[in-house]
């Protein structure tokens, strides 16, 4: 009887720990209007929590005030799927400080999937005055938001040049030059197709990512 009682207590403790861990992990995601998180969002939130509490983590202090707002998978063709993680704009500066290291840690947990970070931004259209806004900040225009998304998607790699190629049929292709010094860092060269697929999904614009010597 004593052995069974001990096992029951142990199993209860394990179950209680698992519930507590999931509760704490849920704090790493804040959805708009109290919407329920998806399975993928819960996975990302748990991964962030695990990194934060890991004794070997060198970014645990930075992660304390960081949470996500959403996570989605994007099809990137032959290379499979990428995980796009959205962060509230108010914590984006904190994310940028550790972007490279945090992406690396998350990609260990989402094996064979590239991870891309994006900040939540709101576009104010030309009817912004109807919303009670007198002046539309440039940062809230469609062009500015798409430019910011471009910087987010490739981060922490830096963009060193852009040019637009217009085809005979009028279609546009944005060519993005990335800093050559980042070519061999963070598996960036293998992510060029991922950057293009994610940017297309988020903005509906075609873009090709490359290094200046390509």
List PLM regions with ranges.
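Intrinsic low-complexity, intrinsically disordered or marginally ordered coil/linker segments
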Residues: 17-214
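Low-complexity, disordered terminal segments
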Residues: 1-7
